[in-house]
Amino acid sequence: MAAVQAPGEKINILAGETAKVGDPQKNEWPEQDRLPERSWRHKCASYVLALRPWSFSASLTPVALGSALAYRSQGVLDPRLLLGCAVAVLAVHGAGNLVNTYYDFSKGIDHKKSDDRTLVDRILEPQDVVRFGVFLYTLGCVCAACLYYLSALKLEHLALIYFGGLSGSFLYTGGIGFKYVALGDLVILITFGPLAVMFAYAVQVGSLAIFPLIYAIPLALSTEAILHSNNTRDMESDREAGIVTLAILIGPTFSYVLYNTLLFVPYLIFTILATHCSISLALPLLTIPMAFSLERQFRSQAFNKLPQRTAKLNLLLGLFYVFGIILAPAGSLPRL
């Protein structure tokens, strides 16, 4: 996303706010440009939209998958642990989205034509985003503490997985800023794939295992497709802003190839599982028409709402995958 500034404005890198040249504060909206006070309902709606809730499939489906694997392998499913795990992962995911909003604005990357205009349009102010992000990270830590109290999982194992995910969500754009040096795809692939599935599985059964990481692969690829479609859409504006993403490195043609790979390899995996293990794993194949629709949209370079539509596919694919695992006969799937 390109850094487009109106004449007479500059970006305050440290504070992440826009200030008029000559404004002595340079860290607050000019008094005459401040928005009028809004109702608490309108502000609550603004906070919800700032979280980008359409992307939450990337965190909810891994939690559901990890819990389903725990149920099928060990016969355990504690609703309290499922709820606590879901809230913890959602809180970290939402906070990570806010960190991304804050740093993209601070670095002058977001602009009036950006998909996320929470700060550009002054829907919220930077300090609002910071406070909300701190609240969500705190909520996630409280949930993690509750999970330790309720689960038999060792503290060091729970802390390793949880704070690994928390660090990934922050460092994606904060601190090191993996997103800006073409490593964001790797962070998302790990955090919202194997790590989240392992977290949900481990808190249920009280121990770690390798096989949930294998079962997480189809979901991880589908989740990465969301990010890659977003980065491909923003390729030109990101290049102008001076940041580097994987989409920029490989170019439009190979970005199209990669998107199709991320989109369709999960179906190949499900076909193999349905053929050799259980027919219930063919359920995710019901979403293939949606995948072909997304492929056509990407090929025609109609990127508007493509990440949101890819997230919808990710949600449906994940739910059918979870149902397929639950419905599979005992012993038909490896390790289940």
From Swiss-Prot:
Subcellular location: Endoplasmic reticulum membrane; Golgi apparatus membrane; Mitochondrion membrane
One Pfam short name: UbiA
Single biological process term from Gene Ontology: ubiquinone biosynthetic process
The keyword Membrane belongs to this UniProt entry's keyword annotation: yes
InterPro entries to which the protein is assigned, alphabetical: UbiA_prenyltransferase, UbiA_sf, UBIAD1
Pathway assigned to this chain's UniProt record: Quinol/quinone metabolism; menaquinone biosynthesis; Cofactor biosynthesis; ubiquinone biosynthesis
EC number(s) reported in the record: 2.5.1.-, 2.5.1.39
N-acetylalanine modifications at: A2
Annotated catalysed reactions: menadiol + (2E,6E,10E)-geranylgeranyl diphosphate = menaquinol-4 + diphosphate; all-trans-decaprenyl diphosphate + 4-hydroxybenzoate = 4-hydroxy-3-(all-trans-decaprenyl)benzoate + diphosphate
Gene3D superfamilies assigned: UbiA prenyltransferase
UniProt keyword terms in alphabetical order: Acetylation, Endoplasmic reticulum, Golgi apparatus, Membrane, Menaquinone biosynthesis, Mitochondrion, Prenyltransferase, Transferase, Transmembrane, Transmembrane helix, Ubiquinone biosynthesis
Keyword set includes Endoplasmic reticulum: yes
Transmembrane segments: 81-101, 132-152, 158-178, 186-206, 207-227, 243-265, 275-295, 313-333
Enzyme class: transferase
Recorded GO CC terms: endoplasmic reticulum; endoplasmic reticulum membrane; Golgi membrane; mitochondrial membrane; nucleus
Molecular function as annotated in GO: antioxidant activity; prenyltransferase activity
Family, similarity comment: Belongs to the UbiA prenyltransferase family.
Its biological purpose: Prenyltransferase that mediates the formation of menaquinone-4 (MK-4) and coenzyme Q10. MK-4 is a vitamin K2 isoform required for endothelial cell development. Mediates the conversion of phylloquinone (PK) into MK-4, probably by cleaving the side chain of phylloquinone (PK) to release 2-methyl-1,4-naphthoquinone (menadione; K3) and then prenylating it with geranylgeranyl pyrophosphate (GGPP) to form MK-4.
PANTHER family registered for this protein in UniProt: 1,4-DIHYDROXY-2-NAPHTHOATE OCTAPRENYLTRANSFERASE (PTHR13929), UBIA PRENYLTRANSFERASE DOMAIN-CONTAINING PROTEIN 1 (PTHR13929:SF0)
Quaternary structure note: Interacts with HMGCR and SOAT1.
Protein name as catalogued: UbiA prenyltransferase domain-containing protein 1
The organism of origin for this protein: Mus musculus (Mouse)
